[in-house]
């Protein structure tokens, strides 16, 4: 499941540089997460770094519109970072 940045976002710029998949970018009003790139940090870290660094609780949550299993997130990570070795 990809993550989603809610309207609680204060545009503090903490999450964007921490994303190892470059899935976070500035949207029209707040930061947004590209669900095609978000692996919830599977393959990189045990927990999503964007959630760790966000100063506002419950601002970055699981996106119910993009449900993925741990295996699907892993496969996405492998395709993005190790496709040349497949």
UniProtKB/Swiss-Prot annotation:
Keyword flag 4Fe-4S: yes
GO cellular component labels: cytoplasm
InterPro entries: 4Fe4S_Fe-S-bd, 4Fe4S_Fe_S_CS, PSI_iron-sulfur_center, YfhL-like
PROSITE patterns assigned to the protein according to its UniProt record, in alphabetical order: 4FE4S_FER_1, 4FE4S_FER_2
Keyword line: 4Fe-4S, Electron transport, Iron, Iron-sulfur, Metal-binding, Repeat, Transport
Residues annotated as binding [4Fe-4S] cluster 2: 19, 38, 41, 50
Superkingdom to which the source organism belongs: Bacteria
Cofactor(s) it depends on: [4Fe-4S] cluster
Pfam family membership, one: Fer4_7
Binding site residues for [4Fe-4S] cluster 1: 9, 12, 15, 54
GO biological process: tRNA wobble base modification
Cofactor note: Binds 2 [4Fe-4S] cluster.
Domain 4Fe-4S ferredoxin-type per the UniProt entry, residue ranges: 1-29, 31-65
Alphabetized GO MF terms: 4 iron, 4 sulfur cluster binding; metal ion binding
NCBIfam families assigned: di_4Fe-4S_YfhL (NF033683)
PANTHER family to which the protein is assigned, alphabetical: PHOTOSYSTEM I IRON-SULFUR CENTER, PHOTOSYSTEM I IRON-SULFUR CENTER-RELATED
Job description of the protein: Ferredoxins are iron-sulfur proteins that transfer electrons in a wide variety of metabolic reactions.
The name this protein goes by in its record: Ferredoxin YfhL
């Amino acid at each position: 499941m990809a993550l989603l940045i809610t309207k609680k976002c204060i545009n503090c710029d903490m999450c964007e540089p921490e994303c190892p998949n470059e899935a976070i970018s500035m949207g029209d009003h707040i930061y947004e997460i590209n669900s095609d790139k978000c692996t919830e940090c599977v393959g990189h870290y045990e927990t999503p770094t964007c959630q760790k660094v966000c100063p506002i609780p419950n601002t970055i949550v699981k996106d119910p519109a993009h449900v993925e299993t741990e295996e699907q997130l892993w496969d996405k990570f492998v395709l993005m970072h190790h496709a040349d070795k497949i």
